[in-house]
Amino acid sequence: VCSSLKSDPITSEIPVIFITAKSDTKDEAYGLFLGACDYITKPISPPIVQGRVRTHLNLHDQNRSLQDAVKERTEELHNTQLKIVQCLGRAAEFRDNETGFHVIRMSHYARLIAEAYSDNKSWCDLLFNAAPMHDVGKIGIPDSILLKPGALDADEWEQMQHHAEYGATIIGNDPNPLLQLSRIVALAHHEKWDGSGYPSGLKGEDIPIEGRIVAIADVFDALTSARPYKEAWPTEKAIALIKDNAGSHFDPELVELFLQQIPQVLEIKSQYPDD
């Protein structure tokens, strides 16, 4: 009975006290091994039994309170980490003459693609929260390059490309799943399906799936958003470019999934306008 109680998640935390005529220490050890919290041999004294029951119930309540407190603090820590990631992502966008809505929109677009690709909700949510960090490395790019209104020359473009590696360095190698995925996104979202991207020239499925997803979301939102140096593209023109670059810049399978989500994409775009 004790083994059954302890093996069921619903009843596993119920304190079990053995009351038995078996007084051998081996029997007592076996009862405790099975999960009992106490072992009382007969003859018994009702006041003593009642006292020990109260003690174990109090200990059980205290353990439950501690578990709840740990869970609450863990959630608070997770929320704090999430807020820091979001703030860093927005900070990078503001340095680049972009609004904070860019990271919000493209994060939603990325989650739409992820949800069409996989039914793993935890992974989709994690990607949604990691996506704002895609351009955090721009913090390390000089203003003379980052804010230049015209085209970059060859040297400036080479330096701009380092922002992917800067982003990975800023995020670091922390084992936290959110930061790990943020690092992947920062490092891989400028890789291209045909291997012509940067920083590593990865090709095809060698590019992490998260980087391939964010690449589509980022480019689409950048094209359809107005900037000091360019007008916003019409949605149809941006969609056509994404289509035309399937198999070269973008993963063709993910492009198809993105195109299937266009109605939801347009809803998100209207929900978070720059103006």
Kindly label every feature range from the protein language model.
Residues 82, 89, 93-275:
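Metal-dependent catalytic cores of enzymes that make or break cyclic nucleotides
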Residues 1, 24-28, 45, 141, ...:
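Alpha4-beta5-alpha5 switch/output surface of CheY-like receiver
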Residues 40-53, 57:
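C-terminal output helix
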Residues 51, 58-86, 90, 94-97, ...:
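Amphipathic alpha-helical coiled-coil "transmission" helices that mediate dimerization
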Residues 3, 7, 12-13, 23-38:
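Alpha4 helix (beta4-alpha4-beta5 surface) of REC/receiver domains from two-component response regulators
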